[in-house]
Amino acid sequence: PVVDLVEKSGCIEVKTDKSAVISQDVVLATNAYIDALPKSIHHGINRKILPVESFIIATEPLDQATADSVINNGMSVCDNNILLDYYRLSADNRLLFGSDSSSEKDMVQIMRRNMLHVFPQLENVKIDYGWAGPIDMTMNASPHFGRISPHIYFAQGYSGHGVALTGLAGRIIAEAILGNDERLRIFEGLKVPSFYGGKYLKNLATKIGVLYYKFLDRYR
């Protein structure tokens, strides 16, 4: 793993435990895992994001009639809740269903309950897989792209829209590295509030926030 970045004569020395690499430019694209980096690398941009767990289950392959009763146009779908449900069919007609769960221990059972609330016709369908992983959220859901220095770039804060935004981020940063930073400067102008208090306060804020948004989704 990288343990430090040192700027030297217009280049960046990327240090590891065993060696070092000299690079003209460096892009930090660690997203929800940025807290694992030393501050000498991230320079405090970790305060702009909050890691939040995302949970997904996958059903067994559905017969075509059942699949069509769920989604019949091949689209990916999400609802308008704050803690939203999102789902699509895979190439082999599995329903991939993502939603909120507050406990990884019983995540599959909670997710199945959420799925059946939307698609009760799947009552007798087996769940083959379930998994979880962190995504990086900003306080106002704006993406956070920019520069720490003239040769150190970063892209984070996709807030659940990484499939669409990561390609855009890569192109915009590549343009800037090649000398055209017009589009990057637009994103650098976005106001992205900071989260303060370190890792433990972030974890507490996440738990409180989930409960608060669940309340809003239920009663608004």
Model-derived features with residue positions:
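C-terminal catalytic lobe of FAD-dependent flavoproteins
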Residues: 97, 105-218
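Active-site substrate-recognition segment that forms the wall
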Residues: 4-10, 19-150
